[in-house]
Structure formats: C-alpha cells, structure tokens
Amino acid sequence: DDPSFDDLYPVGTVAQVRQVLKMPGDAVRVLVVGECRAKVTEVQQTDPYLCARVESIPDAEYVKGTPKVEALVRQAAQLFDEFADLTQRPVQETMLKILASDDPGYIADLMSQSATYGFAEKMRVLEQRHPVRRLEISNKLFAHELEVLRMENQLQDQTQQNIDKGQRDYFLRE
C-alpha cells in the first residue's frame, strides 16, 4: 500500500517499533508499542514515504476515585474476564494489568488492544480524550461484543447438538 495524507485518520497512535519478523511468503510481522495518542499537525514529506509532525493529545482532566470511576473500573474487569473465558484467548497479562490499575483511560486502551470489535469502534475509543468517557465507550462496546459472543457460542452448541443427534439416529438405524 502507498497511503496518502488523505488516507490518515485525524487521531492516531505514536508507536515504537520493537521487533520486525520476516514471515514465510514475503509477509512481515511487526511488533509495535503504543506511546501516546496524537494528531498530525504538518506533513513534512510524501515521497518516498509519508512523514509528518504530530502533536501529542493528552488526556482530559477527571476526578479520580469517584464511585462512578470505581464502578466503571470494576465493570471493565468483569467484562474483560468474561471476554477471556468466551474467546479462550491468551489475555492473562492484559487482565493482570487491568486489575492492577485504577486509571480508566489506561484500562480502556488495554481492553481495545484485545477487542474483537471493528476498527471504527476502536477509533471511537482512541479519539475520546476524556478517560472516564473512554472507559464508558469501551465497556459498552465490550458488553455488546459479549452478547454477540454468547449468541455465537449458543448457535455453535445447537449446531453441534443437531449433528450429534443426527449421528446417533444414523447409528441406531444401522
């Protein structure tokens, strides 16, 4: 791909490349660590690659330790725990970080890294400067995603039961 300035989103992540792995078939896997949210302030060059000056977007101020913040943090931990159970993905390290933090913005960002919802939804989280609102958005997205995952599991169980019943009936007829 050869992205232009028009292909960029207004808010993005400044990230540090930690590792580049060449995979079979000319594929490349890159490990990056996000450092901060930022917006492009000036395009410095477009050829041979896009280069821009960015400005960090700090979190908005919020009152720490309020009952609302505590409730959102607890809800996030519960949602993420159920997500880990339903997806059976290796997210133990992320879960430990969520449990160890009381920063709603940090927790929302951690959850979004592991989330299975779409890119547009992840951008909604990224673009929100207010940490409490960011966690509210993240929790709502996770709650919806959990409903979808539960329904997928239920449909998969029903399908498996139908297959098992069909095989049992076939075996008994033989």
Please give the residue ranges for each predicted region.
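N-terminal low-complexity, acidic/polar interaction/targeting segments
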Residues: 1-174
